[in-house]
Amino acid sequence: MTQFKLGHAAENEWQQAAERVVEQLGDCSDANLAFIYVTDAFSNELSKLLRYLKEQTGIPHWAGSIGNGICCTNTEYYDQPAIAVLACQFPKDSFRIFDMAQEEQQAPPAASPNDFSLRPAVVHGDPRNGHLPQLIAELPEQLGNGYLIGGLTSSEQHYFQ
């Protein structure tokens, strides 16, 4: 597998959109992380959609969000039911999914003083979380030589990340 594969589709039914995405992704047997973005129209079906995609692709780890629109490779979906998935292949143990909004969860591992490698973090934030500014402010310190990528969820009804 190439390190990244993209699949995206706009259909009225989530099943049809998901089938098109899986078809575009092709063989993902080496992928170990996927990013999923859906528009508001599919937000009520997100758990079914995610279950289907996990079963069809075999990708174990997923992160993403819901938005009013999705932009991907020369295509923009706005005000219509759409899905975009980026399947990724990373070295084992080179990434970690964490939820800093949950108090019982640990923060990302701190960088050691001798670690000069770039440590990117893809961050999705719930705009209703009053602690979000503080959580985001703490991330660079915890990441060390970190680089934050991402944004706030922009949805009309759900704020899943």
Positions of predicted regions on the chain:
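Cofactor- and metal-binding active-site motifs of prokaryotic enzymes
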Residues: 1-161
